């Protein structure tokens, strides 16, 4: 049975400020001074390791940095829904988007890639036709508000690329190219894309990101290991990424965070919008 929001709220309060989550101090990420229309956007991406990271822990991190966009891979619908409920309870209501079904060929479908977007951005809708062809979950959403106040809003992509191995190298290359191609198409003019790419910045597939830039690399966080967490950060590999259109989005700050229950570190960035 689904837990009541009151019970979840109590658990959220009991867990305290330091349990389960450690974020490097970074004032440019954890800022409360965002305008109503959010031209400064905070993005968080986390592989929750088959929902090993609890909704309380995930929501605590998202709320602590004021996340406007949250990408969760290897996550159940139930986990994401509880994260959204906890964020709403903290004053950050979110709209939730599940993976496009055709992108779940390699998944049990219980665990997928789910995207949360602030309701203060107005209505977003899934665009299946431009969603990358992955097998562990992907979704692309586009803004429906076209008035001047929302003109800056980006197309948002969340995806999880299949892991590279001897038997599936071709599949990995195909799926990685599908994600990278988003930065070479018309949607790249104003794009935020994040997720578990299962590739480092030094893999050939990420060598040419077209109209995009790695938001973490802009602030020298791009080489910090995000997986596996049992290795120190300098020894891990940075396979979780946030890419943005370099003509519109500039990185004000970025960091990675240790999150209990998952073998991945979360990646976070605060972005500032500018006209071309």
What are these regions (language model features)?
Residues 43-51, 164-171, 227-231:
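Acidic/histidine-rich helix-loop elements
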Residues 42-48, 58-84, 116, 156-159, ...:
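Active-site beta-strand/loop signature of hydrolases that rely on acidic residues for catalysis
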Residues 38-50, 125-128, 152-163:
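Active-site-proximal beta-strand elements of phosphoester/diester hydrolases
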Residues 14-61:
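N-terminal signal-anchor transmembrane helix
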Residues 20-30, 69-154, 158:
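Structured beta-strand-rich core segments of catalytic domains in phosphoester-bond hydrolases
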Residues 2-15:
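Single conserved hydrophobic/aromatic residue that forms the stacking wall/gate
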């Amino acid at each position: 049975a689904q837990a009541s929001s009151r019970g979840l709220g109590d658990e959220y309060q009991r867990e305290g400020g330091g349990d389960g989550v450690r974020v490097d101090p970074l004032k440019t990420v954890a800022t409360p001074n965002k305008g109503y229309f959010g031209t400064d956007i905070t993005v968080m991406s986390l592989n929750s390791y088959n929902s090993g990271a609890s909704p309380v822990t995930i929501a605590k991190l998202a709320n602590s940095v004021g996340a406007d966009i949250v990408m969760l891979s290897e996550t159940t619908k139930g986990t994401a829904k509880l994260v959204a409920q906890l964020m709403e309870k903290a004053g950050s209501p979110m709209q939730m988007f599940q993976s496009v079904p055709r992108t779940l060929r390699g998944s049990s479908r219980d665990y997928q890639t789910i995207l949360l977007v602030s309701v203060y951005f107005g209505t977003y809708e899934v665009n299946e036709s431009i969603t990358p062809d992955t097998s562990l979950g992907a979704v692309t959403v586009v803004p429906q508000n076209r008035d001047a106040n929302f003109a800056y809003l980006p197309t948002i992509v969340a995806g999880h690329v299949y892991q590279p191995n001897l038997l599936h190298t071709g599949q990995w290359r195909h799926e990685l190219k599908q994600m990278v191609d988003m930065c070479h198409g018309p949607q790249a003019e104003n794009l935020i894309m994040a997720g578990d790419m299962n590739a480092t910045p030094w893999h050939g597939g990420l060598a040419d990101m077209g109209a995009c830039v790695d938001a973490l690399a802009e602030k020298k966080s791009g080489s910090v290991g995000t997986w596996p967490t049992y290795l120190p950060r300098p020894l891990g590999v940075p396979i979780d990424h946030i890419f943005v259109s370099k003509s519109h989005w500039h990185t004000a700050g970025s960091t990675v965070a240790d999150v209990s229950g998952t073998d991945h570190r979360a990646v976070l960035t605060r972005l500032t919008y500018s006209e071309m």
